């Protein structure tokens, strides 16, 4: 069995360099919620050095709230903003001898695109326009995954090691209790259940079906690196290969 491990980078976390030794894919902030041209260059350089797949992490234009503010923008605006961000990272990667492989939206752009078909379509269209060979990463079973498939893109369905789930397979909003799993044993058990058995227990006790093709590791938690190492070790024991 194979699984991709991804992390969001270039967002100002001190753990970026070490996380790149533990993951197989990097989602690099493109300036709209965090990062700038120099951090994008630095992250690409380190990803290439570690053999990690390079990906863009586009966002709503919301540096003030780290891309976590809900926005109602016209689809054409979202299309243009997404194309702008991923095009910039693709060029930075190419200039350093690398290749951008995937795109994963950030924060509220990701969450809204999981449920809003027009927004999902705008993102998928931008990814296709940039490069039809790019992989589109989205929440398992989401509108974004469906939109990517409609455009003929390769999609990758994502699950979260440290996030609580609702009965419909969506994430518990960060503003609600149960959104974050802080117990490492619980997070490990949830991740294995999703990867090995394709299901997750919701905060209300029901099982939700999920297709786990990539697991997101958050690098901004207090114990992020320690958990990443434990997860890698657990996968190794279970014979699960980590690869993009």
UniProtKB/Swiss-Prot annotation:
Keywords, alphabetical: ATP-binding, Hydrolase, Nucleotide-binding
Database matches in Gene3D superfamilies: Glycoside hydrolase/deacetylase
CDD domains, per the entry: LamB_YcsF_YbgL_like
Protein name (record): 5-oxoprolinase subunit A
The organism of origin for this protein: Shigella flexneri
Quaternary assembly: Forms a complex composed of PxpA, PxpB and PxpC.
Recorded family membership: Belongs to the LamB/PxpA family.
EC id: 3.5.2.9
HAMAP family: PxpA
SUPFAM superfamilies on file: Glycoside hydrolase/deacetylase (SSF88713)
Function: Catalyzes the cleavage of 5-oxoproline to form L-glutamate coupled to the hydrolysis of ATP to ADP and inorganic phosphate.
Keyword DNA repair: no
Gene Ontology terms, MF aspect: 5-oxoprolinase (ATP-hydrolyzing) activity; ATP binding
Keyword Transit peptide: no
Reactions that this protein is recorded to catalyse: 5-oxo-L-proline + ATP + 2 H2O = L-glutamate + ADP + phosphate + H(+)
Cysteine disulfide links: none
Any one biological process term the GO annotation gives: carbohydrate metabolic process
Pfam families for this protein: LamB_YcsF (PF03746)
């Amino acid at each position: 069995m194979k699984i991709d491990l991804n992390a969001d980078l270039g967002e100002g976390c001190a753990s970026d360099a070490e996380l790149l030794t533990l993951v197989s894919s990097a989602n690099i902030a493109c300036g709209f919620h965090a990062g700038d041209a120099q951090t994008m260059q630095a992250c690409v350089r380190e990803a290439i050095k570690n053999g990690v797949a390079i990906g863009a992490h586009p966002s709503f234009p919301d540096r003030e709230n780290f891309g976590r503010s809900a926005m109602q923008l016209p689809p054409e605006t979202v299309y243009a903003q997404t194309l702008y961000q991923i095009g910039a990272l693709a060029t930075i990667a190419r200039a350093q001898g690398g290749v951008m492989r995937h795109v994963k939206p950030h924060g509220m752009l990701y969450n809204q695109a999981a449920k809003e078909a027009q927004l999902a379509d705008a993102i998928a269209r931008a990814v296709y326009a940039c490069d039809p060979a790019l992989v589109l990463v989205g929440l398992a079973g989401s509108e974004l995954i469906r939109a990517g498939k409609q455009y003929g893109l390769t999609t990758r369905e994502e699950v979260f090691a440290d996030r609580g789930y609702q009965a419909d397979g969506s994430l518990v909003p960060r503003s609600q209790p149960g959104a974050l799993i802080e117990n490492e044993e619980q997070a490990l058990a949830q991740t294995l259940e999703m990867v090995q058995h394709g299901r997750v227990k919701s905060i209300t006790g029901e099982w939700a079906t999920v297709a786990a093709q990539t697991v997101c590791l958050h690098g901004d938690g207090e114990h992020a690196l320690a958990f990443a190492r434990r997860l890698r070790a657990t996968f190794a024991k279970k014979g699960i290969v980590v690869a993009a």
